[in-house]
Amino acid sequence: MKKSIFKIALLNFCILVLAACSSDKDSTDEVIVDPPTQSDPLTTQNVLTYMVDASATKETQALFYNLKRLGETKTAIGQQDAFNSFYQDAGGYSDIKKNTGFDPAVLGSDFMFITDKNNNEQLNNWFYQQELKIVSDVKAAYAKGIINTFSWHLREPYKEDSFYTADMTADQKSTAFRSILPGGANNEWYKKKLDKVASVISNLKGSNGELIPIIFRPFHEFDGSWFWWGANFCTAEEYKKAYQFTVDYLKNTKGVHNILYAYSPDNSYSTVEDYLTRYPGDKYVDVLGMDNYGDLNSGNDGYNRANAKLKMLSIAAKTRVKIAALTETGYQVTATTPPINNWFSTNLYNVLHDNRTFDLQFNTISYVMFWNNTKDGYYVPNGTVSNASDFKTFAEKSKSALLNSLPKMYEMPK
C-alpha cells in the first residue's frame, strides 16, 4: 500500500514539474532537451536522389549533405554583402568579424548589378566593377570554407529601372511576370538575363579549378506585393512555371551544375499546406527557406509565431529530405530605432532552437542570414555599439556556428 501511495505521489510530482517547465514562457535559459535521433534516409551515397541536379558537382553534393546534417545540431550564421557593407562605412573586416573575431559562416550576394542593363563588361563601368567585386568575394569566401548564397533583385523587363511595384504602372505590374514565361513577349529578354547568370556561376572556380557551389533563391518573398513577381501579379501555376523554367534553363540548357535552388517566401505562411501553394516541386527545390522580418519585430507574440513557422518549415524539409533555412531576417538599429535587449542571444536564439511544446518536433534550421549593414543602420552589430555583446553571446552559443565552428562544407564526410 505504501509503495502504491509512493508511486502515485512520485507520478504527481513529475506531472507538476513538467507542467511548471512547459508553462515557463519567460525563461531565457537554453533548452537542454537534446533532439531525438533522426531516422533520415539521406546518406553520402544517395545524396543525388534528393537533389534537384542529378549531375551536381561533388562539391555541390557535399554542400547539400553537410547543410542538411548541420541543421540537426547547429545553425550557420551569415550576412548579406558581409565583406562590403559596414555600419558607418567603417571598412576592414566584416562587422561580424569585428565583433566576434571570426568570419561569418554564410555570405549573401545578389545578381542585381551583374544583370543590370548598364553592365557593359568594361573595366571602367561601375556595374561591371560590382560584378568583379562580387565574384572576388565569393571566391574568397569559398577558399575560407564559407557558404555562398545569391538572391536576385531582377529589375522589371520594360524599362529595367526597378524591381519594386511601387515604381511601376498598373499595366506593367499586371503583365511583367507573365511576359517572361515561355511564349511571353519578354521570354527572350529573360533568357538573356539567365545567360549572364549562368556565365558568372560557371566561372566561379576554386584554386584547383573546381566549380564553387552556390545557393540560388530566385523570385524570393513572392507572397508579398512589393516585387513584380509577387502573388498579386501572377497565379500559383504561373509562378511555378517561371521557377521551373529558370531551373531547367540553367541546369539543362546552360549546363550549370553547381547550384542548390532555394524556395523562399516571406513570412505569411503558417501551415505546410499554405507554404506549398506556389511550391514548384521537389524536383526543383533543394532548400526550403523563409524570409521573416515582421514576426521578429513584433514582441513576444511575434517570436512565438516565428518559432512555430520555423518548426513548420523544419517538418516540411524533413518530410522531403530538403534543407531548411531562415533565408533572411533581422532587426535594423538606426539613430531613431534603438536595439532590443537580448534580441539576438535570447529572442532570436529561442526562435531558432526552442521547443517549448515538447512534441519532439525540433527545428532543424541549417542557416540564418541577416540583411546588410549600411552607413546609417545595422542588422549585425560591430564591436563598438551598445548591443555588441548580445550578438557575440548569440554567436557563441552551443547551437550557433560562425566559420570557426563550421565543418568542411565542400567535402563529403568519410
Identify the role of each PLM range.
Residues 18-44:
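Bacterial Sec-dependent N-terminal signal peptides
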Residues 77-80, 213, 217-219, 243-273, ...:
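Aromatic-lined carbohydrate-recognition surfaces of secreted/lumenal glycan-active proteins
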Residues 1-19:
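Sec-dependent bacterial lipoprotein signal peptides
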Residues 116-252, 256:
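Substrate-binding cleft of extracellular glycoside hydrolase catalytic domains
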Residues 75-80, 322-414:
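Substrate-binding cleft of secreted/luminal carbohydrate-active enzymes
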Residues 35-113:
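Boundary/entry segment of secreted carbohydrate-active catalytic domains
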Residues 278-336:
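Glycoside hydrolase catalytic-domain groove-lining segments
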Residues 62, 88-96, 132-135, 199-200, ...:
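Alpha-helical scaffolding within the catalytic cores
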